[in-house]
Amino acid sequence: MTDFEDNPCNAPLHPRAADGLRLFNAGEYFEAHEALEDAWNAEKGIVRDLYRGILQIAVTYLHITRGNYNGAIKVYGRSLKWMKDWADVCRGIDVAGLRRDAETVMREVTRLGIENIREFDLTRLKPVSWDQGFRKQKQIYVCDRCGSEMFEKNCKVTCPNCGNRFDCSDLNIYFD
């Protein structure tokens, strides 16, 4: 058994999650949400909840940029459920830092209240810190059936999410 089978935080980041983090860090919160939602839908393991939590923080920040106090409060409240039980670092993502940053943002949003939300200083929306080289591989194998990332073992691959077996000729291969 590999260490990422024992601990899902040790596995590589889904490629669409990486796209989502890059978009999040560029302040493109709607697009980040879309990419992270793709990763969340493709992922069948427990780490999908981490992607869900991050995408909800992206939506929270989107609401803040649009001056939508109620939307920010509501979506941030939902994100707490998905963000609370993760290791401080998971799949190279500084989860603890993101939680702290989001809590700081929401304290300020709450302080401003619905009447003054448009006064929120957008420079308080910090990027997600993550190790872009974490478990980076030269080739990423993606299951044609469920879209999950797989790992080669002598050109025989089993999808960790749906259990389908493939040989290398059956796979979509993406190069970094």
Explain the meaning of each model-derived region.
Residues K153-K156, S169-N172:
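Short Cys/His-rich "knuckle" micro-motifs
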Residues I140, K156, R165:
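Residues immediately within or flanking Cys/His clusters that coordinate Zn2+
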Residues L21, V59-Y61:
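Residue-level recognition of tetratricopeptide repeat
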Residues M150, F166:
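Cys/His-rich microdomains that often coordinate metals
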Residues C143-C146, C159-C162:
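Short cysteine-rich clusters marking metal-coordination/redox-active sites
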Residues Y69-A87:
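TPR/TPR-like (Sel1-like) alpha-helical repeat modules
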